[in-house]
Amino acid sequence: KRKDSFDKPITYKRVGHFEENDKDYFGLNKLIREIVEEPKYKIFSDMDGVLTDFEGRFEKYSNGMKPADYEKKFGKDKFWELVDGEGVAFWVGMPWMSDGERYWDYIKDYDTQLLSSPSRSNTSRLGKRLWVRNNMPGVKLILAQAYLKKNYAAPNHILIDDRKSNIDEWRAEGGIGILHTSAADTIQQLKKLGL
């Protein structure tokens, strides 16, 4: 121990070891405590099938046929022709998932941004941006093809997505992936992480 110019005792300890009653003149103990005890998560949320009801919207234009069935019957090109043929309106008019607002209310106060894949047409980029502006103004939207989502993965970065392949790639890059099946299940998994 020695005395500094303020005549207060300074105790030297190993980094990361501190006691509640230690003097913390420079805020180092507080900073260490935040780093060690409170992981800071960044949430990246998918839109289609998580927040927005892509399947329901698609069925409106496909005479009630589910997207997977339509693609299987007519092929991927015809599938995207149907979606992109509706232009910006397809995306702007997308309804919320039945539990989408509950899910959003739970995550919106964390460091959260949207990470969504556009379709083959640029109209989806505009439509998704307009949907976000109309439904959750000010929220950051990143548009990236599905195979590029993994580039945003990092320790303590959480991807919430309804596609298992996106989750698997995210985890392979060191991120935390939550396969979204419902708001209730995703919220439960977030609670396990302390959120």
Each predicted region: which residue ranges?
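Acidic, Mg2+-coordinating phosphoryl-transfer loop and its flanking beta/alpha structural elements
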Residues: 158-190
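Short, acidic loop-to-helix structural element flanking the phosphoryl-transfer center
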Residues: 84-114, 121-126
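Active-site neighborhood of HAD-like aspartate-dependent phosphohydrolases
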Residues: 39-84, 172, 182
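Charge-dense, intrinsically disordered terminal/linker segments
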Residues: 1-43, 50, 68-69, 96-101, ...
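Substrate-recognition "cap/lid" segment bordering the active-site pocket of phosphatases
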Residues: 115-158, 164-168
